[in-house]
Structures are given as C-alpha cells and as structure tokens.
Amino acid sequence: MLSFLDREHTVAKPGFSRWMVPPAALFIDLCIGHAYAFSVFNLPLTKLIGVTASAPQDWTLAEVGWIFSFAMLFLGSASAVFGKWVERAGPRKAMVAATCCFAGGFFVSALGVVTHQLWLIYLGYGVLGGCGLGIGYISHVSTLIKWFPDHPGLATGMAICGFGGGAMIGSPLSVLLMNYFASVDSVGVAQAFVALGIIYGLFMTIGAI
C-alpha cells in the first residue's frame, strides 16, 4: 500500500525537470524552519494559568527556555543517527517520517499545554520535532545536491534560504494564531500548536510526495 514511498519508486521518469525539486524542498524548508521561531511561545507558556500575568503555578521562563535547545540537540543527533537510513530509504519515505515527527511534535506539545505537563512539550517540540527537523533537513539537502551536482552551492543555498524563511513566516503566523485563539481564560498556545501541526503536516506531505 505504501510501496510508492520506497526508494525505487522515486526514480524520475523521462522528461522530468530537475527544477521541480527545489520548490518541493522549499515546501519542507518553510515548515521545519519554524523551529527558529519558537521564542514567540516562551512568554505565553509562562502565563498558561494566569493568562494575563504569570501565576505561581505557571512555568518560569528558565524552564521553557530549554525547549528550543532540545530541538536543536535532537536536530543534530537525528541527522547523525539517521543519515545512512535516509540514503537507503530514499527522500520520499524519509520526508514522510520527518513529517510525522515534526507535525506530531506539535500535537504532543499541545497535549502538554492542556495537561500542564512541561515534559510533554520537551518530548513533543524538543525530541519529536527535533528529530523531524534533522531527518527532514538532511533528506532534502542530499536530494538537492544529487540533482544539482554541477551547482552544489546553489543547491545548499536554496535549502538554507528556505530554512531561514520558515522562521520569518513561522513567527508572525504563530502570533496570529495565538491571538486568534486567545480568550479570557486561555493564551491560545495549545490551539496554535494544533493548527500549526495540521498546516505544516499538510504542506510537508505535499513537498514529500
């Protein structure tokens, strides 16, 4: 049923233009680049209970500040650990795995916000999201380099450009969603996480397939 994800089914057919690859990679980059926009959640996460101001039961900025660091740690770790698997599995299967991890990380984080369990946010955004970042980044970068062996700098440049662009889009989008879902008894973080998981899951799936 999922055999179309296998490496042998990702061989380009005659007439395929390699310039179709960068837009697909850009879809991925603009999503996973959201990791660099996580700081917009730091302050709202310290007011989940107090809403307008931090309550004694709320988390401190120091407690939530390490979530981004965890994501970066697992980005590097996943890249190193799963690098050979990505080459064996092929870009399509690797990107689907990255999508499941990255989007799933938002859903787990939303559960952590609703239940006020900080470790779930570390698990969701930090571990799962970080692994999705790592797998997603190396899979499309290696694919771009293979398609553009005559322009390796251009290939990696396109990837890095999209990665940075993801933060530029992700930051205002996250703020917009939190403001939209905010109410007198909620800062809107949980709902924003769910919405982002759906949005990024959809766009990453399009880019992967």
Where are these regions (language model features)?
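Symmetry-related core transmembrane helices of the 12-TM Major Facilitator Superfamily/SLC fold
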Residues: A190-I209
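C-terminal ends and interior cores of transmembrane alpha-helices
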Residues: C100-T115
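Cytosolic juxtamembrane N-terminal segment immediately preceding the first transmembrane helix
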Residues: M1-I32
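Intracellular juxtamembrane helix-capping segments at the cytosolic ends
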Residues: L45, L133-T156
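Central cavity-lining transmembrane alpha-helices of secondary-active solute carriers
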Residues: W66-K84
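Small-residue (Gly/Pro/Ala) motifs that create kinks and tight helix-helix packing interfaces
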Residues: N42, F82, G166-A182
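Hydrophobic core of transmembrane alpha-helices in multi-pass small-molecule transporters
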Residues: L30, G105, L118-I135
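Glycine-rich segments within core transmembrane alpha-helices of 12-TM secondary carriers
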Residues: P149-P172
